[in-house]
Structure formats: C-alpha cells, structure tokens
UniProtKB/Swiss-Prot annotation:
Pfam families, A to Z: YL1, YL1_C
Gene this chain is encoded by: Vps72
Residue ranges for the DNA-binding region feature of this UniProt entry: 156-206
UniProt family annotation: Belongs to the VPS72/YL1 family.
Biased composition (Basic and acidic residues): 127-142
Entry PTM: Phosphorylation is enhanced by ZNHIT1 and promotes the interaction of VPS72 with histone H2AZ1.
Tissue expression per record: In all tissues examined, most abundantly in brain and thymus.
Name the UniProt record assigns to this protein: Vacuolar protein sorting-associated protein 72 homolog
Glycyl lysine isopeptide (Lys-Gly) (interchain with G-Cter in SUMO2) crosslink, residue number(s): 115
Record organism: Mus musculus (Mouse)
Quaternary structure and interacting proteins, as annotated: Component of the NuA4 histone acetyltransferase complex which contains the catalytic subunit KAT5/TIP60 and the subunits EP400, TRRAP/PAF400, BRD8/SMAP, EPC1, DMAP1/DNMAP1, RUVBL1/TIP49, RUVBL2, ING3, actin, ACTL6A/BAF53A, MORF4L1/MRG15, MORF4L2/MRGX, MRGBP, YEATS4/GAS41 and VPS72/YL1. Component of a NuA4-related complex which contains EP400, TRRAP/PAF400, SRCAP, BRD8/SMAP, EPC1, DMAP1/DNMAP1, RUVBL1/TIP49, RUVBL2, actin, ACTL6A/BAF53A, VPS72 and YEATS4/GAS41. Also part of a multiprotein complex which contains SRCAP and which binds to H2AZ1/H2AZ.
Region (Disordered) residue spans: 1-164, 339-361
C-alpha cells in the first residue's frame, strides 16, 4: 500500500493549477494547422505577400550528411508555413443599379414597339437577363409570339357564336343506318380474317391404312361372391356365442375390411380399325364337319354303338344279336371276305396310309 493512497488530502491542493494553465504557452500546431482557430476581423479575402505563400525548405535539406553545422549554439528561426484558408467561398455582391448602355435614338423607338408586342413575362424580366440572352434566340421568341397571337385572332373570328341544335328523328335514323352499314362491313372483314386463319392452322396428319391400337389400363378387381354359409344347429355342439363374444370379432372384421385397399388388376385392350386386319392377324380355321347321325338298320333308331367285326352301327343288344347271326349265315354261304382272310395268321400287315384306317379295310355287309 502506497503512502499517497493512505494519507489525508492537502487543503491547498490545486491552487496553482489555474496559474499554470494561464502561463502555458500556446502550441504552434493549433495556431498554424488549417489556418488557425482564431478569427481575424476583416479577413474577407485571402491576401498575403509573395514571401508568405512561398514554400520554405528546411535548412537540413541543404546540408549534406557528411557536413556538420558550424555553430551548435545558434537558435533555429521559427519555421513559417503557408496558411490555408478554410472559410467558404462567397460570391461578390451584384450591383443593384443597372448599367447604362448607349443606344442610338432610332433603336430606342424600335425597342418600345417590341416591348408592347412581347408578352408580360418577357417584359417583367430584368435588363440583365435580356442582355444575357442571345440576339437570335430573342428574335425567334418574338416571331413565335406574333404567330401565336395571329392564329388566336383568326380562330376567334372564325368561330363566332355557335349553338348545337338537337338532331331530329329522321337525322338520327340516317346516322343509325350509316353506322349499321359500317358495322356490317367490319363484321364481314372480321369473319373473312377468321376463316383465313382457320385455313392456315396446321391440320393433324391422319395415318392412312389400318391401325392397331394397344391400350393398357388398371381396373379394380371384382371378386366373385363365395358360397353362402348356412348355420346348422346340431345338438351336442357348443352353445351359440353370446352378443358380448361376437362384438369384438365383428368390430375387428369391419376394421380389417376398411383398412385393406381394394385390389387392382391390369387389362389390355387391342383394337383393330377394320375386320380385314383382324382376320389377317387372327385367321379362323375351317369349321369342323358335323358328323352324320347314323341309324341302326334293325331298329331304325339313332345308332349308339358300332360292331367291331362288321362295322355296322346298332342301337340295342337285340339288334347286335341279329347282326351277328346274319354275319354267320353270310360266312357259311360265301366264306370269309378277302380282307378278313388276309388278316389271318401271318406277318402283321403294313401300317395303313394316312386317311385310311381299319374301317377302310373292312367290308361292310349289307343285311337284307
């Protein structure tokens, strides 16, 4: 802890401070920089001697580095610097009295005439503004003003009192007829332009010839209704569930059905422009031959069977027995047919040609 911080302050502290401030020398920097901070009376314009405005070079620049000054005790002279004026520029006041211009007597009369012809705005202007204007500009302005006055006078004479009278009904009808004709012509022109515009519109080119269109879409899947279940009461089985037991199951089924989105399936459609193209790509085969309905020769009914030996159709067992008995009598009288004897013991016959079968090799026996 220092002694100055612990002792009591002196009663005479600061008495000599005001004297020191008054005795303090004014700094040369504040007196010379930017022209100084003191205002001088009557310093309207900057005036200075030629010696004040010239820049002075320090004496140190004239002496070489190797040379030493001859005397160290000589006092250096105060350096004088150029004073800079910082006050705002003021324009000199204009004299209120107009300057007199000597003009001949003949020109004064002409000027009076021009003054009467010029507008009031040009007459009220001061003499300085009139003299500053170029002579050619003033002449053009005067001529323009004269032309405007002349036109205004002519228009007043032409107009005179004018009263518009109301049109009669006949005149209104004439104007309406003329307007109607103009509107009709305008409408015809508009319609003609619209027709020309439609003709110029590029029409879509149609593809000549047959067209096959392929179109694939997604459609919701519709399920087939399942078989309806019937409740069957059987004695001895579990009792019917109560309403409390069915409630949660019913709610669960409804929620599951609502949460499950419907299924979708794709469908593809192929469209042909004409039937000829369809038949070309999907040719139809020859219609199958309708088999001839054979009749039993014994009962004259539609034959349901065929005898493998005689190849004769028959309808009933009684007809079959009659056919076999007739076949035995034929063999006894005429013997076996040549095809039957050839099919006896021996090597197997060659394979039949296409279109020929065992029925073609058999010889039908006509029963009388």
């Amino acid at each position: 802890m220092s002694l100055a911080g612990g002792r009591a302050p002196r009663k005479t502290a600061g008495n000599r401070l005001s004297g020191l401030l008054e005795a303090e020398e004014e700094d040369e920097f504040y007196q010379t920089t930017y022209g100084g901070f003191t205002e001088e009376s009557g310093d309207d314009e900057y005036q200075g001697d030629q010696s004040d405005t010239e820049d002075e070079v320090d004496s140190d620049f004239d002496i070489d580095e190797g040379d030493e000054p001859s005397s160290d005790g000589e006092a250096e002279e105060p350096r004088r610097k150029r004073r800079v004026v910082t006050k705002a520029y003021k324009e000199p006041l204009k004299s209120l009295r107009p300057r007199k211009v000597s003009t001949p007597a003949s020109s004064s009369q002409k000027a009076r005439e021009e003054k009467t012809l010029l507008p009031l705005e040009l007459q009220d202007d001061g003499s300085d503004s009139r003299k500053s204007m170029r002579q050619s500009t003033a002449e053009h302005t005067r001529q323009t003003f004269l032309r405007v006055q002349e036109r205004q006078g002519q228009s007043r004479r032409r107009k005179g009192p004018h009263c518009e009278r109301p049109l009669t009904q006949e005149e209104l009808l004439r104007e309406a007829k003329i307007t109607e004709e103009l509107n009709l012509r305008s409408l015809e022109t508009y319609e003609r332009l619209e027709a020309d515009k439609k003709k110029q519109v590029h029409k879509k080119r149609k593809c000549p010839g047959p067209i096959i269109t392929y179109h694939s879409v997604t459609v919701p899947l519709v399920g087939e209704p399942g078989p309806k279940e019937e409740n069957v009461d059987v004695e001895g089985l579990d009792p019917a569930p109560t309403a409390s037991a069915l409630a949660p199951h019913a709610g669960t089924g409804t929620g599951a059905a609502a949460a499950t989105p419907p299924a979708h399936c794709s469908r593809t459609f192929i469209t042909f422009s004409d039937d000829a193209t369809f038949e070309e790509w999907f040719p139809q085969g020859r219609p199958p031959k309708v088999p001839v309905r054979e009749v039993c020769p014994v009962t004259h009914r539609p034959a349901l069977y065929r005898d493998p030996v005689t190849d004769i159709p028959y309808a009933t067992a009684r007809a079959f027995k009659i056919i076999r008995e007739a076949y035995k009598k034929y063999i006894t009288a005429h013997g076996l047919p040549p095809t039957a004897s050839a099919l006896g013991p021996g090597p197997p016959p060659p394979e039949p040609l296409p279109g020929s079968g065992p029925r073609a090799l058999r010889q039908k026996i006509v029963i009388k």
